[in-house]
Amino acid sequence: LNGIVYASEKPENLQILSAKPLDDMMMILTFSTGEQRLFDATVLTGSAFAPLADEKIFKDCKVVDGIVTWMDEDIDCAPEYMYEHSYAYLA
């Protein structure tokens, strides 16, 4: 509404511009909205995400076409999901 995104609303055409992996499966994400948000990747469960438990694999992420990917794009996570499950980060 009037260029303001409220907490209950997801921005349209959301993309991730950068991802900075931290310890303990946390990462700082920069979204196309300009927001930086803290994402706890332990919410990524199931066999598809099991390799991310290896810290070396988790920290070797790349952003491809606005999506965070791992293992040469074999694993990815939708920007909308990461936005909904992250918290505002104030550096």
Predicted regions and their residues:
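Motif-centric detector for short Cys/His coordination patterns
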Residues: L1-A91
